[in-house]
Amino acid sequence: MKSLVIVFVVLLGVAMISANEEELLAILQDQRNDARGGCMNRYKSNICGTLVTPMNCIAPRTRMGKFARKFCQFMCGIC
């Protein structure tokens, strides 16, 4: 009985996601059109590219890596 309830809840969730497909596609299209709006290069001339390099983007536990992923997103390929 519990597994039947779980199956119905999962099917209901899938149906809700499928029903809003057009709305989700519209949101995705808006984000793609405005992708550069959230990716500002505030440290273009002095830090990103000179002090912080693309290799810092892949360092998960370093301060430089955290800084690169937060402020040099264009360089890390996040944008």
From Swiss-Prot:
It is found in: Secreted; Nematocyst. It comes from the Eukaryota. One of its GO terms (molecular function) is toxin activity. Residues 20-36 form a propeptide. Keywords: Nematocyst, Secreted, Signal, Toxin. Its main location: secreted. Residues 1-19 form the signal peptide. The keyword Secreted applies. One of its GO terms (cellular component) is nematocyst. Coiled coil: none annotated. Belongs to the sea anemone 8 toxin family. This is U-actitoxin-Avd8a. It comes from Anemonia viridis (Snakelocks anemone). The lineage of its organism: Eukaryota, Metazoa, Cnidaria, Anthozoa, Hexacorallia.
